[in-house]
Amino acid sequence: SGLGRNPTNNPLGQILRLLNQNVDLIKYKGWKVLFPETHFDLEVGNNPFRNKIKNLRGEDSLKEWDKFISSVKPLSNIVNNIPLLASSPQNLNLFEGLDLARKILPNINQAFKLTKSFGYLVDENLNDPFLRNWVDLLSFLISGLPMHDTNTAAMATLFSEWFEPEAYLEYPRGGSETIVNALVQ
């Protein structure tokens, strides 16, 4: 997700914009989830997953999830306010620097968590096995690695995008080849 948004924190989306390449995207909200315990259809967005937690795991797990999401939000705010490709530290002017500081200072006491694996946040906040497996699955989908080896900034970006009310997923029409062709152009 994030290729079709402008601005976007998706590094690939930023590179495609710098290259003036547009990719035709198929947008969708739902997907099928298969777990050993159960399988279900799910839509991205905060409420569909909260409802699924409540139905599958109960109120205590929902409270645990809400606490976890609250711990991720400050990190998402930091990551979403740092321009990945928009400007280089070498040419960041004073006003851009002040604007950046204004955006990240409210959450700066949480910034050290960005240097740890995402599993660190999970270990601090989630005990429910289903929720832990869920985050491990999302980590694998983003990085190809388990949550304890996945970059926290990448996951904070995912959580800020996937759990918004207007969230959606994207797939390039024509598959990965479409992305490769756009980059080669």
Predicted regions and their residues:
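Hydrophobic (often cysteine-bearing) scaffold residues that line and stabilize catalytic clefts
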Residues: 8, 114, 118, 131, ...
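Flexible hinge/switch segments at interdomain interfaces of large molecular machines
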Residues: 149-159
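Helical element adjacent to the flavin cofactor pocket in flavoenzyme catalytic cores
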Residues: 157-185
